[in-house]
Amino acid sequence: MAGNIREKLDDVIRRYKNVTDLVYNNSGIMSRFENTGTVSVVQARNLGAVGVAARASGLKRDVRASHPFQAYTAMQYSPSSLETGDVLARGYLRKLEVDLSYSVIMNLLEGFQGPGAEVSPKPDYHMKFRTDTLAVSLTEGWRGEISHCILTDAKGDVLASRIKDPSVHNWTMLALAVRGAEISDFPLCNKSFNLSYCGHDL
C-alpha cells in the first residue's frame, strides 16, 4: 500500500512541478506578481491573519507547529514562510507548502505498516458529553486555522456550536491588498488569497 501511495504521489508532484516551473520561470508572470497586493507583517499581525496569507507576509502562524496533534507531535514541524506579502509570495508559498507536505507524507510512509484489522472504530453516537463545558479545537486547514467551539448544558447536551473559518480573518487582508491598486490587480489579489465567500459568514 505504501509503495502505491508513493508512486501516485510522485506522479502528482512531477506534474505539479511542470506547472510551477512554467509559472515561476516566466519573467512576464513574475513581474506581474511581484509587488502586487502587498500586505505587511504588521498589518497581518494586527488583523489576526492565518494560513498562507499570514505566512506569506512573514507571520509564521501554523496550528501544526503551535498546537501539534497526532503525527505532528512526533516531528519538529516548521512551516514555510516568506516576507514580501505580495501575490508572488502567496503563490510561491503554496509551492513550498506542497514540497513540505510531500516530504512529511514520505517520512510518515517510512513507518507505515498498512491498515490494521479495524481501520476506524465505529462511532459511539450515544456518548454523553461532559456537562457545563466549553470545548475548543484547532486544525490547520488548507486556508489556515479552523476553530470549533462547543458549549454543553447541565445535561451534557450541545447548547451551542460555532465554527470559525480562516476567511473570517483574511478577507480584511484582501481589502488592504487592493487598496489604491488598479482594477486589473483585483483578480490577481483575490485569487492569491483564494478565500471562502460562505466561510466569512460562519
Q: Residue locations for each model-derived region?
A:
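Active-site bordering "gate/hinge" segments
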Residues: 1-202
